[in-house]
């Protein structure tokens, strides 16, 4: 009781940050450059779907299922590393804000891979799934580049990981993302 004989007001609990005053999820709170409200809602739906125990957090088993449903291959070691990297409160689980951060990073990675695939397809004129010397010759000519076959072959040799004189998409992706470059 206070000095005037009144009880102090009861402590008010604050709603979780992802809910608005009415207790409804407000995607606008999570929108940022490169991420629309619609995308936030899609990610929230996945989060809710895999938060099977309704705790507003996802444990390692739930995270693996969520990543798989969004089209990502997720190995156990990767899942535990993601949780370790993103679990800012040390709970061993991921809340929605942490999950959103993870998914936006993965979506960005997936989108850039799709863009690189489009560029690869421009080089792969025969749609054979590989870039050959003939393909490079054609692109160089279209771009007005005067390169002899030895220069073009050197480009292929630098990108070709298995020595078959062809550049696969994986080779091309690795070069474009600077994962390998001899």
From Swiss-Prot:
Listed GO MF terms: calcium ion binding
Residues annotated for Ca(2+) 2 binding in this entry: 87, 89, 91, 93, 98
Binding residues annotated for Ca(2+) 1, in chain numbering: 51, 53, 55, 57, 62
PROSITE patterns, A to Z: EF_HAND_1, EF_HAND_2
A Gene Ontology term for the protein's cellular component: cytoplasm
Keywords on record: Calcium, Cytoplasm, Cytoskeleton, Metal-binding, Repeat
EF-hand domain ranges (all copies): 38-73, 74-109, 111-146, 147-182
CDD domains named among the record's database cross-references: EFh
Pfam families: EF-hand_7
Disordered: region residues: 1-31
Compartments, as annotated in UniProt: Cytoplasm, Cytoskeleton
InterPro entries per record: CALM/Myosin/TropC-like, EF-hand-dom_pair, EF_Hand_1_Ca_BS, EF_hand_dom
Note: Binds two moles of calcium per mole of protein.
Family per similarity comment: Belongs to the centrin family.
Function recorded in the entry: Plays a fundamental role in microtubule organizing center structure and function. Component of the infraciliary lattice (ICL) and the ciliary basal bodies.
Protein name, entry field: Caltractin ICL1b
Organism from which the protein derives: Paramecium tetraurelia
């Amino acid at each position: 009781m206070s000095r005037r004989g009144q009880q102090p007001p009861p402590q008010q609990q604050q709603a979780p940050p992802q809910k608005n005053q009415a207790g409804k999820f407000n995607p606008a709170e999570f929108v940022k450059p490169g991420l629309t409200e619609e995308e936030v809602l899609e990610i929230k739906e996945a989060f809710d779907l895999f938060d099977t125990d309704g705790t507003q957090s996802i444990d390692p088993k739930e995270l693996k299922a969520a990543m798989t449903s969004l089209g990502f291959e997720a190995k156990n070691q990767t899942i535990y590393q993601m949780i370790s990297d993103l679990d800012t409160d040390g709970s061993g689980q991921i809340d929605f804000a942490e999950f959103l951060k993870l998914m936006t990073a993965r979506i960005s990675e997936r989108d850039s891979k799709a863009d690189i695939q489009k560029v690869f397809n421009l080089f792969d004129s025969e749609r054979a799934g590989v870039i050959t010397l003939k393909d490079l010759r054609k692109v160089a000519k279209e771009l007005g580049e005067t390169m002899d076959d030895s220069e073009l072959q050197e480009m292929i040799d630098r990108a070709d990981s298995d020595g078959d004189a062809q550049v696969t998409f994986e080779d091309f992706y690795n070069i474009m993302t600077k994962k390998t470059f001899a």
